[in-house]
Design a protein with these regions (language model features):
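Bacterial N-terminal signal peptides that target proteins for export
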Residues: 1-10, 43
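N-terminal signal peptide c-region/cleavage motif recognized by signal peptidases
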Residues: 16-17
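N-terminal "mature-domain start" segment
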Residues: 22-59, 136-140, 147-150, 201-241
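A mature extracytoplasmic/lumenal domain signature
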Residues: 32, 41-43, 49, 78, ...
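Soluble non-cytosolic domains of exported or imported proteins
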Residues: 34, 116-120, 185-189
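Short, solvent-exposed coil/turn segments at beta-strand boundaries
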Residues: 38-42, 67-71, 150, 171-178
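Surface-exposed amphipathic alpha-helical segments
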Residues: 43, 94-99, 103, 125-133, ...
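Conserved polar/disulfide-associated segments of primarily extracytoplasmic proteins
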Residues: 51-165, 169, 239-242
Length: 242
């Protein structure tokens, strides 16, 4: 009996240790793409392209990891060069063709931009969301939300084919689109650790935490000043403000 108990105890310890090891996630950070998030293992990086709502083809990267408990990915689409593409398109348009030219100058440039490039930035979160809604899914949650005070869209979907669940957070920061996607099998718990770990980093890898909500369509486009970072003094109020 002693030997049996020892074997059982040893087996239990080994199984527990294996279970803990299996649950150890790593924090992954990428300074070039400006984000940090936890993955269950070192993510695979795939260079790809993303076609925008206005038809621009932009560089993108997919960071992905997979385990028996689900598939986890972060897609980053770089919109920072889209204004140049918009100018190139606008210059090739027939004279007076506003639907092609957009607004390369004038009062509506900050809204529409050359070749509708600025409007494409403003539309990026909605368009990425729409692409998911076109799939064979049932929407069970669709909210405005924020992660690290950067606004975005939060969705939960049930995939019709196998009843797996997809959890999404789609945001935009400094004119880069972030699509955080976790899909788990039917009956599995929500991937809370992955969902809640998203953060944004600067070119030196320092975490970015604002004092107020960051909205890319205003702050990324510099229509409004970027909110101060945590630990910085708040901006001075205009004269006469209270």
């Amino acid at each position: 009996m002693r030997a049996t108990r020892f074997v059982l105890a040893f087996t239990t310890v080994v199984m527990a240790a294996s279970s803990v090891a299996a649950q150890e996630w790593i924090e992954y950070q990428n300074k070039d793409d400006g984000f940090k998030v936890v993955f269950p293992n070192e993510p695979k990086i795939t260079d790809t392209v993303w076609t925008t709502e206005q038809g621009y083809v932009l560089p993108a990267r997919v960071y992905s990891a997979e385990t028996s408990s689900g598939r986890y990915s972060m897609t980053v689409v770089d919109y920072t060069g889209i204004e140049r593409l918009g100018m190139e398109r606008s210059q090739k348009c027939p004279v007076g063709a506003e639907t092609c030219q957009g607004q390369p100058a004038g009062g509506l440039r900050p809204v529409i931009g050359p070749g509708y490039a600025t409007q494409d930035i403003r539309d990026a979160i909605v368009y990425a969301t729409f692409k998911y809604l076109q799939k064979d899914v049932r929407v069970t949650e669709y909210l405005w939300n924020w992660q690290d005070l950067v606004e975005g869209h939060q969705l939960q979907l049930t995939n019709t084919a196998d009843q797996s669940r997809t959890y999404l957070y789609i945001s935009m920061h400094e004119n880069k689109l972030y699509i955080q996607d976790a899909t788990v099998p039917k009956g599995y718990p929500e991937p809370g650790l992955f969902q809640q770990s998203l953060g944004y980093v600067d070119k030196d890898g320092n975490g970015i935490r604002y004092q107020a909500i960051y909205s890319n369509e205003f702050h990324g486009l510099r229509i409004d000043p970027v909110p101060p970072l945590a630990g910085q003094p708040p901006p001075a109020l205009p004269a006469g403000a209270r």
